[in-house]
A protein has these predicted regions:
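Catalytic pocket-lining loop regions of alpha/beta-barrel enzymes
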Residues: 52-164
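Mid-to-C-terminal alpha-helical segments outside catalytic/metal-binding sites
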Residues: 153, 157-164, 173-224
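Short hydrophobic/aromatic-enriched beta-strand-loop microsegments
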Residues: 11, 15, 39, 95-100, ...
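Alpha-helical elements of Rossmann-like donor-binding domains used by nucleotide-donor carbohydrate transfer enzymes
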Residues: 26, 30, 83, 117, ...
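Conserved, mostly hydrophobic/aromatic
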Residues: 13, 40, 65, 100, ...
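Short, small-residue-enriched loops and turns at beta-alpha junctions
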Residues: 19-22, 47-51, 104-107, 136-139, ...
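Mid-domain alpha/beta scaffold segments of enzyme catalytic cores
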Residues: 1-68, 74, 112, 121, ...
Length: 224
């Protein structure tokens, strides 16, 4: 929490805990003592077992997150998505955020399975998706044209009310700098009503992460 304490514009922290640890609840309770703690990220992508999210020990940890009114971010790829609906069903009050739109394989263009599995999440109203990290999945052509199909699909399936923008900084700098990343997404999105833009670039994050009204995560009001 050092950075959150040092910079007032950091209004919320999504941290990491070992979801399989027997004392995960105690660790969450310690973190909750910090006023900016908002949730946990489950890094399924980093696990060698693609069924990691289905483990009983992990699901117990996720229940502990849900019981404390926290948000669960999911760092997943296409192969992990079949387990997400079960998490939503078992924890209907848990706010789930699929980071980076589950990292669609933009570079290969093999999106059929990703589309199918993402569409299966739509019926669950407690699942949101973070529009972030796309240019780094686009291979040698990190352009608006490259990411437009997945952005359009996300808007069509989930609607703007269930999408949150994220910069994915500093990882995003592997493909483009901060300003270029932001502007490329704007180009890929195309025209948006002002109200929809406000939701995507801040309003939805305020609601999902329970941030104080009037805050602007990451300085979005001054974004280019």
């Amino acid at each position: 929490f050092q950075l959150a304490d040092a910079y007032p514009w950091i209004t919320g922290v999504v941290g990491w805990v070992d979801l399989e640890a027997p004392a995960v609840g105690e660790q969450l309770d310690r973190y909750r003592q910090h006023p900016k703690f908002r949730g946990v990220r489950a890094t399924a992508e980093n696990m060698p077992d693609s069924d990691w999210l289905a483990r009983p020990s992990v699901r117990r940890g996720i229940r502990a997150v849900a019981e404390r009114g926290l948000t669960l971010d999911l760092l997943v790829r296409t192969e992990h998505l079949p387990h997400v609906p079960r998490l939503a069903e078992e924890n209907p009050d848990l706010r789930l955020v699929v980071d980076h739109l589950a990292k669609p394989p933009i570079a290969t263009g093999e999106l059929a399975r990703w589309r199918e599995r993402m569409a299966a999440l739509v019926p669950y109203p407690n699942i949101w998706c973070k529009v972030s990290g796309l240019l780094t999945e686009a291979g040698p052509t990190p352009t608006a044209e490259a990411i437009r199909p997945v952005v359009a699909f996300a808007l069509e399936q989930f609607g703007v009310s269930r999408l949150l923008w994220g910069s994915d900084w500093p990882v995003s700098t592997l493909a483009a700098d901060y300003v270029a990343t932001f502007r490329t997404l704007l180009e890929a999105l195309g025209p948006l009503e002002e109200a929809d833009r406000a939701l995507l670039f801040g309003g939805n994050a305020l609601r999902v992460y329970g941030l104080p009204a009037g805050d602007s995560p990451g300085g979005l009001r001054s974004a280019p």
